Regions:
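Auxiliary, metal-adjacent structural segments of Zn-dependent hydrolase domains
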Residues: 12-58
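Active-site scaffold of zinc-dependent metalloenzymes
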Residues: 46-77, 92-106, 111
Length: 116
């Protein structure tokens, strides 16, 4: 069974990245960060509180969970880690609806260049 542990240090990095790139629409009180270890190629993934879940649980505000596969994430450079964090943050739409934004790789590259 996969075990998840909170990753407050990754949340702090994400807050810094968002601050530098003017991603002010992200409410970090409703974005949660976790590490896990698993034998997959995935480095990170984001999960939202989709509209159908919001209908079932109307008393819960939309939120996001970003998980990092420590086995893969820790192997890459800090710059690549920051790009991965940024990539996941860019999936959060300006409406903070619990859904995802589709992002073009050119947008990720442009924002990455702004961050560096």
């Amino acid at each position: 069974m996969v075990e998840y542990t909170e990753a407050p240090e990754l949340k702090e990095r994400a807050i810094k990245i968002a601050g530098k790139l003017n991603l002010a629409h992200i409410d970090f009180d409703r974005v949660h960060f976790y590490r896990y270890t698993c034998d997959t190629r995935t480095c990170a993934k984001i999960t939202g509180f989709f509209k159908t879940l919001q209908l079932a649980y109307p008393h819960i505000n939309p939120f996001y969970v970003i998980t990092f596969n420590d086995k893969n994430f820790s192997r890459v450079s800090e710059q690549e880690q920051n790009q991965t964090i940024l990539h996941e943050l860019l999936h959060i739409p300006k409406t903070f609806s619990g859904e995802f934004s589709k992002i073009a790789h050119s947008k990720i590259y442009k924002k990455s260049r702004e961050f560096i």
